[in-house]
Design a protein with these regions (language model features):
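Conserved positions within compact, well-structured domain cores
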Residues: 46-254
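Positively charged n-region of N-terminal signal peptides that target proteins for export
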Residues: 1-4, 20
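Intrinsically disordered, low-complexity segments enriched in Ser/Pro/Gly/Ala and basic residues
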Residues: 11, 17, 38-39, 111, ...
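Detector for intrinsically disordered, low-structure N-terminal pre-sequences
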Residues: 12-16, 29, 201
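Sec-dependent N-terminal signal peptides
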Residues: 4-13
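Generic early N-terminus positional signal peaking at residue ~5-7
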Residues: 5-6, 24, 83
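Sec-dependent signal peptide cleavage junction
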Residues: 18-60
Length: 254
């Protein structure tokens, strides 16, 4: 009955939107098949109006893969059940999902890029504390999956890039990179998850992806380091983005 109710609402919305307009769908509002989830171009982080203060539990099938590197890498993103699933988007240093990703809703500022309240190395950007790595309480991996997990640093992303072969491929309908260790041959898959745009829109799914590191871009603290990739580009060296943006997170553990 609940599913029918949501479908009726959804159909009434769709009927009032022209084919040229962008329709933002609350991702969990209806029960979608895996194929529908893959083909749907737009995702919101969680249903509009839903209170979101519960941890995002790690699915039982998620494992830590030993690639012969300094850390082990999870098989899935936070919020994902399978490696090809998108999972959820987070602003840097925030541990909960939300609907809108803009400076005005960012936890660690007072509404703008020059009013940072934490993780700041420049007085022109806010209150200086010289913190450059996320504390555990602000690490979405640790706070949602447990203390044995955390977000990777920018150096760990660089190690992943430099020590593995990256092959653009498609897994169960999702484009992304199969990343295979040159040390022991083990592999993981990073899906092309897109990224948030203009606050609550997600774009470039199956084309591009951004994954947060736990490392601040100390030269300008309104940014943090990320892994960014597309089919013909893999960026981590000096790749950074605005902290308020919603990107995915791939946890690591010892």
């Amino acid at each position: 009955m609940k599913r029918i109710y949501f479908l009726i609402i959804l159909l009434s919305i769709v009927c009032g939107v022209s084919a040229q307009e962008t329709l933002l769908l609350p991702f969990d509002a209806v029960e979608l098949t895996p194929e529908q989830k893959i083909s749907s171009p737009i995702y919101l982080a969680y249903p509009l109006g839903m209170k979101n203060d519960m941890p995002i539990m790690k699915c039982d099938n998620i494992e830590a893969v030993d690639l012969g590197l300094s850390v082990k890498w999870a098989t899935c993103n936070i919020g994902a059940e399978y490696p090809e699933d998108i999972g959820y988007y987070f602003a840097w240093g925030e541990i909960q999902r939300k609907v809108s990703y803009v400076w005005e809703t960012y936890k660690w500022c007072r509404g703008s890029e020059n009013t940072l309240t934490k993780y700041c190395t420049d007085s022109s950007c806010g209150t200086v504390d010289n913190k450059t790595i996320l504390e555990q309480r602000d690490d979405a991996a640790a706070m949602n999956w447990g203390n044995e997990w955390r977000m990777p640093t920018s150096d760990e992303f660089k190690e992943l890039k430099d020590s593995c072969d990256w092959v653009w491929t498609t897994q169960n309908g999702r484009n992304g990179y199969t990343i295979t260790s040159r040390i022991n041959g083990n592999s993981i898959f990073f899906p092309a998850t897109g990224y948030t745009w203009m606050g609550n829109e997600v774009v470039k799914v199956n084309q591009l992806a951004s994954y947060w590191s736990s490392s601040l871009y100390a030269a300008n603290p309104i940014y943090a380091h990320r892994l960014y990739f597309g089919e013909n580009n893999i960026g981590i060296d000096d790749d950074y983005s605005y902290r308020y943006k919603g990107y995915n997170i791939r946890p690591v553990c010892p």
